[in-house]
Amino acid sequence: MDFFSLNKIIKPNQKFTSNEAEFLQIATDYLEESQNYLQKGLKQLKKEYKRSIIYNPNLEYKRFVKWKENFTETFESYYDRFFITKYNHYSLSLLFSFINEQIETVIASYNSFLNEHNKLAFNKVSFSFEKKLFEATQQFNNLEKNTAISDDLPLQFKVRTTQLKAQRERELKNLLNKIKLKNLSEKKQEILLNNWFNSNERLFLKNEVKKVNWLNSPRQKQQAAQIDDQNIIELKNVYKYITNGITTNAVLKGVDLAIKSHDFIVILGPSGSGKTTLLNIISGMDRASSGSVIVNGYNMICLNDRKLTKFRQKYVGYIFQQYGLLPNLTVRENIEIGANLQPDPSKRISIDALLEAVGMDSLQKKLPNELSGGQQQRVSIARAFAKNPLLIFGDEPTGALDLEMTQIVLKQFLAIKKRYQTTMIIVTHNNLIANLADLVIYVADGKIKSLHRNLNPKQVEEIHWI
């Protein structure tokens, strides 16, 4: 069976369009073409390996379909992201690149599955007990690699994990003896093996869910930590696990990181790499499952939800990817909400100056539903700036902005950082923004793959943006 490739998905050679309706149609057609290709590929895998456990490809395909539905429903809010004001047209190259990030994740899971099965040294027969056993064993090995670990875990969870492994091995030994002693049909062998796998997988995951739920609750430890004069943020061996109540997944895996005060930090990485989770943990939007997270002297893993909220109110400004504006308040009132979170009036940044800087002064009486996605993003940015917090975090803060406004906003980022000595940390897919950063963090597969410190960060006008 051939490997899958992005190049096999048909897309137009057209690079841009000035027609909004045509842009929407091209996007819709490409999304449908992509889903059809991925759906057909998944069916081929299931047909070719019908007796295999096609776990990751199936999971990634479902994730893509859900993302596509959400993207299609909110497509209008993304217009500014792909519109090049200077040339007055929509960039199809930017559109395809954005969609392809999601497609490539699914294709990678398909090809990884193919590659793994091509290496299996078993002959193709209608049913091979040895092959099926190997696959089931490999699946348990993969589950155990993803098991939740922490020195904080109560002994009962560790004991239960050991007991389940011993039980699984004991039941498998009994199953093999039964098959050896009795002349069972291939169908009966397959049923017995599937029952063994499903039963033990269910018990394993049930225990993992309990572990993750415990790890994601606040710890009973000293909340204050020694403040580092140089590093405002320090992470040591940080893990983050998530669960939907049925399965679990490690999103961050053993992250170590130190961030200096007053730096501008850019976090890069592919979709699903864990970069937004990392941002949420260091900003107090979420708690780590294990490890040490010290932010401005606070031991974040020990703070309950109420104390995390107080921490954010006191120290943090956050620019959300989906804007997070209050729908019944005007542009100005939304920004005032941010300013009023700063208890020291002398530290607040002028709302009038911010409105002018982000080009929203003439729209300050408008409600969010009267604004485009890019305009709402500008309000979200101004709201975070108005508070003049110690730390500013942004999840794709320029993602909905056109090229011209992106440059204006980034200049504001750097100006506020310089004037108020603010520490700024943003997640972005735009690699060019990394040229402005003091430190660039590249995240992949839940780990920090590289750290790069720019000794001479560039200014916005020094970057070739097109």
From Swiss-Prot:
This is Putative ABC transporter ATP-binding protein MG065. PROSITE patterns: ABC_TRANSPORTER_1, ABC_TRANSPORTER_2. The lineage of its organism: Bacteria, Bacillati, Mycoplasmatota, Mycoplasmoidales, Mycoplasmoidaceae. Keywords: ATP-binding, Nucleotide-binding, Transport. The keyword Nucleotide-binding applies. InterPro entries: AAA+_ATPase, ABC_transporter-like_ATP-bd, ABC_transporter-like_CS, MacB-like_ATP-bd, P-loop_NTPase. Residues 233-463 form the ABC transporter domain. ATP binds at residues 269-276. It comes from the Bacteria. Belongs to the ABC transporter superfamily.
